[in-house]
Amino acid sequence: MIKWLWKANQPQAEMLAQWREALNIPLLAPLNEEEQQRLVSVASHLLQQKRLVPLQGVVLTPLMQARLTLLFALPVMELGAKWLDGFHEVLIYPSPFVVDDDWQDDAGLVHSGQTVQSGQSWEQGPIVLNWQDIQDSFDLSGFNLVIHEAAHKLDMRNGGHSNGVPPIAMRDVAAWEYDLHQAMDNIQDEIDMVGVDAASMDAYAASDPAECFAVLSEYFFSAPELLENRFPLVYRHFCTFYRQDPLARLKRWENESQNIESSSPMG
């Protein structure tokens, strides 16, 4: 078990200064000062509630702990840490890991064997991650293992199993399901046309609604322009559910960065 090395009851300004290095990753660059403070507040609560369990020689430094928890906190920054109270442990392998798995083929036959996994979210248990892919989740590439697994846990809050529909108002469920399935079909059509490797989005999103929600949540936070361009209705659903607009946040940050550059004296 990892014991958090920083205090959670510090003044916000002091706490933010200690988290500054942890916040310094491309994924979190668009957040303004107020948003960073909210994110750190949620992350601090999560660190008090979760056990980080390093496996197979993984050594978690305070900076690694902080960055991992900030990734968990991002999707619930406006919802609150309580939305991730469905698990108590995070198991961390050094790299993708081998598990015994059962799966069903297109003919309905069930197969058993070993598969390589990047992460898992158990319905009645922990989240399992690997540090190699956690590090690849720090940028704005559209890939984010931590957000993917956190999305599964949010999905499970709606009845205890993941089906692609997190807790939303009943009046919104039909439109959510329709638009999500339309996105799945669109992604599958693209895969059929150009192949998995040339597809513009992760083919895993077309496998089932639960994976579609998790994969598109990755794009929502780390490649919002792509998601909004491809599936604007899904993007708006996600804005309502997560209570965030990452694309607006990204554009604000880009404009501010351009203004700073244009006002800088020529060197």
Swiss-Prot record:
Broad class of enzyme this protein falls into: hydrolase
Cofactor: Zn(2+)
Cofactor note: Binds 1 zinc ion per subunit.
A UniProt-annotated Pfam family: Peptidase_M90
GO biological process, one term: proteolysis
Matching InterPro entries: MetalloPept_cat_dom_sf, MtfA_enterob, MtfA_fam, MtfA_N
Function: Involved in the modulation of the activity of the glucose-phosphotransferase system (glucose-PTS). Interacts with the transcriptional repressor Mlc, preventing its interaction with DNA and leading to the modulation of expression of genes regulated by Mlc, including ptsG, which encodes the PTS system glucose-specific EIICB component. Shows zinc-dependent metallopeptidase activity.
Quaternary data: Interacts with Mlc.
Listed name of the protein: Mlc titration factor A
Species of provenance: Yersinia enterocolitica serotype O:8 / biotype 1B (strain NCTC 13174 / 8081)
Gene: mtfA
